[in-house]
Amino acid sequence: MINILNAIILGIVQGITEFLPISSSGHLLLFRHFMHLKLPIIFDIYLHLATVLVIIIYYRQRILELFLTFIRFSLRKTNKSDLTNLKLILLILIITIVTGVVGTFISKYERMFILPFILINFIITGILILMLEFNFFKIDFKGNILLVGIFIGLMQGLGAFPGISRSGITIFSAVSLGFNRKSAFEISFLSLIPIVFGAILFKYKEFYDIFMVLNFFEINLGALVAFVVGIISINFFFKMLNNKKLYYFSIYLFALSITFCCFFRI
C-alpha cells in the first residue's frame, strides 16, 4: 500500500523524468523496486495524466490554434495559412494510432519489465540521445506524411518499454527525418496528449479500480506533486534542448546502468 512519502517521491520522479529523455516509466519502476511497492501500471498512467496537464498548459496557445484550424476545416473555411496546422494534425493522428497499436502489443508483456531489462533500455536510450546530439542518423521519406507518421509512431511506441525514453526516441525520430529540435519537441509532447487519454480509456476499468484499491489522498497527492515539478522540468528541458547539451543525459543513463550492474550485481 502506498503512503504519503511514497506518493511524494513517485510524483517528484514522474514530474522530473517525463520531460527529460531518461524514461519516466523506467525510473518509476526503479524507485518502486527499492521502495518494495507493487502498484498497478494504471497508477503510472495516472501520474502521466498529471504531466499531460502540464503539456496542455504549456502548449495552450498552440493547441487552441490547432483546434480552431480543425473547426475551420470541418466548416470548409480553411485558408492557405491553415495548411501547416492541418498537416500537423494529420501527423499527430497517424502517430497516435500507430503508437497505440504498438503500445497495446507491448503492454501484454509487462512481466518482462524486470530490472536488468530496464537497465539495458537505459543504455539504448543513452545511445539514441548521443545519435540525436551529433546528428548521426538521417532518413528521408520525401515529405510523405503517412510514412513519417508511421515511422515516428513505431519509434514512439517502443517508448512503452520501461527504460526507453518516449520523449527521447520520438525527438530522435523527428530530428532524423529533418525536423528542427523545436518542432520535434512539439510533435513529441502534443502527440502524448491523445496517447495518455487513449490509454486511460483503454484501461478505464483499471483506472476506476485504483481509487478502490489504493489510498485516494495519496495517489492524488502524487499526481499533484508530478504536476508542480513537471512545470519546472519542462522549462529546464527546453533550455537543455536549445543549448544542445542533451549528451549529459546519456552520461547519466550510462552511469546509472553501470552503477546498478556493478554495485547491486544485477
UniProtKB/Swiss-Prot annotation:
TM region positions: 2-22, 39-59, 86-106, 112-132, 145-165, 184-204, 212-232, 246-266
GO biological process, alphabetically ordered: cell wall organization; peptidoglycan biosynthetic process; regulation of cell shape; response to antibiotic
Reaction(s) catalysed (UniProt annotation): di-trans,octa-cis-undecaprenyl diphosphate + H2O = di-trans,octa-cis-undecaprenyl phosphate + phosphate + H(+)
EC numbers: 3.6.1.27
Keyword entries, A-Z: Antibiotic resistance, Cell inner membrane, Cell membrane, Cell shape, Cell wall biogenesis/degradation, Hydrolase, Membrane, Peptidoglycan synthesis, Transmembrane, Transmembrane helix
Topology of this chain in the membrane: Multi-pass membrane protein
Keyword hit for Transmembrane: yes
Cellular location(s): Cell inner membrane
Cited Pfam families: BacA
The keyword Ligase is assigned to this record: no
A Gene Ontology term for the protein's cellular component: plasma membrane
Record GO terms (molecular function): undecaprenyl-diphosphatase activity
Protein family according to the UniProt entry: Belongs to the UppP family.
Misc note: Bacitracin is thought to be involved in the inhibition of peptidoglycan synthesis by sequestering undecaprenyl diphosphate, thereby reducing the pool of lipid carrier available.
Function: Catalyzes the dephosphorylation of undecaprenyl diphosphate (UPP). Confers resistance to bacitracin.
Name of the featured protein: Undecaprenyl-diphosphatase
Organism: Borrelia garinii subsp. bavariensis (strain ATCC BAA-2496 / DSM 23469 / PBi) (Borreliella bavariensis)
Gene field: uppP
